[in-house]
């Protein structure tokens, strides 16, 4: 058990180097810093809004706007496609983490605060925070019981509200950020929309709290814990599989060589000679490594949970599980495979 947790901690350190160490060595972080200092968005003549909150947070928000601008401006299809692919996995993994936070043994632990981890992932990187959360989850697990046996009946109502709170708290700010600026320029700018989106975990938490208060009268009604958990799991799996299938389908069927070349190769994070040619290229490598390490870690955690429940698996069962994971990764990506495994073994 401890070995899996230590391995996940190593992946968190690897994520830190793949994101920031590699970004420093290939010049991406320097490009971001220069763009922020010049108060100009990369590749455009549009000035960077430097006074959004009037506090020290403006420097952080300014750098985040610089990063996300090429993702959203529509001029870099490979980068936008990777972001779309990643977006579904982000929703799926945080739905799963929220469900896990309602496990009875974790109610008074650090894992009870998924909003904190989600905000840290926004500021640091998913490749750093998700492996860290997975390691803490393994250390704090008091029993191998499936989650449907560990969740109280009252908590099942809260779990049932997680998909709705994600749609409202994550979906609405995301739509506002993705819409062309011409559709809302009289209300707010694209840069403001990017800044507002950054704290989506807080919106999700507020929506979830509000819905729980609103539907408090229904808490006494009977609800199947398994039904609530599987509903949340099904929502997470759909969020993972659709962007995965669409992004890879477009890459493999439309066959624009420049787009396919952007999506397929993985630049080695340890290489010190490769240099980014633009903010878009650096952002693509950033998202690729963030996606790979973050979601790969989550899959390893899900497999650990599966093996913990099935403590007497035979060699053939282990081979079958490995084959199943491979097929699921092809169909839905590593995050979708993790969600499926957890749902299948009633971990949700």
Curated annotation (Swiss-Prot):
It comes from the Eukaryota. One of its GO terms (cellular component) is membrane. It is a multi-pass membrane protein. Pathway: Mycotoxin biosynthesis. The keyword Metal-binding does not apply. Glycans are attached at residue 51. Citreoviridin inhibits mitochondrial oxidative phosphorylation by binding to the beta-subunit of F1-ATPase. Ectopic mitochondrial ATP synthase is a factor that mediates HIV-1 transfer between antigen-presenting cells (APCs) and CD4+ target cells, and citreoviridin can completely block antigen-presenting cell (APC)-mediated transfer of HIV-1 at the APC-target cells. Inhibition of Ectopic mitochondrial ATP synthase by citreoviridin can also lead to suppression of cancer growth by activating the unfolded protein response. Its main location: membrane. Its EC number is 5.4.99.-. Keywords: Glycoprotein, Isomerase, Membrane, Transmembrane, Transmembrane helix. GO terms for molecular function: isomerase activity. It is found in: Membrane. The chain crosses the membrane at residues 2-22, 77-97, 116-136, 161-181, 191-211, 235-255, 283-303, 323-343. Hydrolase; part of the gene cluster that mediates the biosynthesis of citreoviridin, an inhibitor of the of F1-ATPase beta-subunit. The HR-PKS ctvA accepts acetyl-CoA as the starter unit and catalyzes eight iterations of malonyl-CoA extension and four iterations of SAM-dependent methylation at C4, C12, C14, and C16. The KR and DH domains selectively act on the first six iterations to generate the hexaene chain. Belongs to the membrane-bound ascI terpene cyclase family. This is Terpene cyclase ctvD. It comes from Aspergillus terreus (strain NIH 2624 / FGSC A1156). The gene is ctvD.
């Amino acid at each position: 058990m401890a070995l899996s947790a230590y391995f996940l901690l190593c992946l968190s350190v690897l994520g830190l180097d793949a994101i920031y160490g590699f970004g420093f060595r290939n010049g991406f972080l320097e490009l971001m810093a220069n763009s922020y200092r010049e108060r100009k968005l990369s590749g455009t003549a549009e000035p960077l809004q430097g006074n959004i909150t009037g506090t020290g947070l403006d420097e952080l928000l300014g750098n985040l706007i610089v990063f996300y601008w090429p993702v959203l401006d529509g001029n870099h299809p490979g980068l936008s496609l990777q972001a779309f692919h990643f977006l579904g996995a982000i929703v799926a993994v945080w739905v799963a983490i929220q469900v896990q936070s309602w496990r009875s043994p974790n109610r008074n632990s650090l894992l009870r605060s998924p909003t904190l981890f989600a905000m840290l992932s926004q500021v640091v990187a998913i490749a750093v925070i998700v492996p860290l959360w997975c390691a803490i989850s393994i250390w704090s697990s008091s029993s191998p019981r499936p989650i449907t046996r560990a969740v109280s009946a009252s908590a099942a109502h809260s779990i049932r509200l997680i998909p709705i709170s994600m749609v409202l708290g994550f979906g609405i700010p995301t739509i506002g950020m993705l819409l062309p600026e011409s559709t809302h320029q009289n209300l707010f700018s694209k840069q403001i929309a990017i800044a507002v989106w950054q704290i989506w975990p807080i919106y999700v938490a507020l929506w979830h709290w509000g819905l729980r208060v609103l539907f408090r009268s229904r808490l006494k009604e009977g609800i199947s814990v398994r039904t609530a958990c599987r509903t949340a799991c099904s929502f997470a799996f759909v969020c993972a599989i659709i962007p995965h299938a669409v992004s890879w389908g477009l890459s493999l069927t439309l066959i624009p060589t420049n787009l396919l070349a952007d999506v397929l190769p993985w630049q080695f994070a340890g290489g010190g000679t490769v240099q980014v040619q633009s903010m878009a290229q650096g952002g693509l490598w950033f998202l690729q490594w963030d996606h790979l390490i973050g979601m790969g870690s989550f899959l390893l955690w899900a497999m650990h949970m599966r093996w913990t429940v099935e403590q007497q698996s035979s060699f053939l069962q282990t081979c079958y599980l490995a084959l199943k994971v491979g097929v699921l990764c092809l169909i839905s990506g590593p995050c979708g495979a993790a969600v499926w495994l957890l749902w299948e073994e009633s971990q949700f």
